[in-house]
Amino acid sequence: MNAQAEEFKKYLETNGIKPKQFHKKELIFNQWDPQEYCIFLYDGITKLTSISENGTIMNLQYYKGAFVIMSGFIDTETSVGYYNLEVISEQATAYVIKINELKELLSKNLTHFFYVFQTLQKQVSYSLAKFNDFSINGKLGSICGQLLILTYVYGKETPDGIKITLDNLTMQELGYSSGIAHSSAVSRIISKLKQEKVIVYKNSCFYVQNLDYLKRYAPKLDEWFYLACPATWGKLN
């Protein structure tokens, strides 16, 4: 937790915005209801998903607190789209702020305005890096890119490799978050990565044993972590 996030939390509470507690599998917002909010995820882990008409689930992004998630446009105060934000950690603490309240709060304090602006700026550059790597290297690049993201954000070094400490990360979940809906395609790529000793899967967890391989197929994402999150990048490099 950085100092800016702590100060933003205090600023919200000083202005009457109280934290809400959520539990695993709860939805902070869902794609069937209006979503004109700013969510300040203080702690916990969530995932942003979209469910198609035929029931296909796509995991668009994982968020780890502290993080700012915008579900409404600041200028029009309308929804940016219809998605689900599901809690996947045991508990999560979030501040749910109406867009008109956010505008008023940020107009009074440039420090917090720039904190939110910087966070959203990072999200845009992250999305560009992800789109680049997922597009250029096909399905293998998508899986390697998503594994690299999860390794940097949730990785912990162990004797067996870098353990991705995200609960219940199955091959199906990995496929959904990589934009691959067919489990057979995910299975083939995972088998290839196992054979090449890039990863192992045991005790319901992925272990990365060749980080350089993932970086080779996701260079822009690796570059993004190096530039935007140097402390996170430096722990494993």
UniProtKB/Swiss-Prot annotation:
Gene3D superfamilies recorded: Jelly Rolls, Single helix bin, Winged helix-like DNA-binding domain superfamily/Winged helix DNA-binding domain
InterPro entries, per database record: cNMP-bd_dom_sf, HTH_CRP, RmlC-like_jellyroll, Tscrpt_reg_HTH_Crp-type_CS, WH-like_DNA-bd_sf, WH_DNA-bd_sf
Keyword annotations from UniProtKB, A to Z: Activator, DNA-binding, Transcription, Transcription regulation, Virulence
Molecular function via GO: DNA binding; DNA-binding transcription factor activity
UniProt domain HTH crp-type: residue ranges: 137-212
Record has Lipoprotein as a keyword: no
Coiled-coil region: none
PROSITE patterns reported in the protein's UniProt record: HTH_CRP_1 (PS00042), HTH_CRP_2 (PS51063)
UniProt GO cellular component terms: cytosol
Role of this protein: Positively regulates expression of listeriolysin, of 1-phosphadidylinositol phosphodiesterase (PI-PLC) and other virulence factors.
Name of the protein this chain belongs to: Listeriolysin regulatory protein
Species assigned in the record: Listeria monocytogenes serovar 1/2a (strain ATCC BAA-679 / EGD-e)
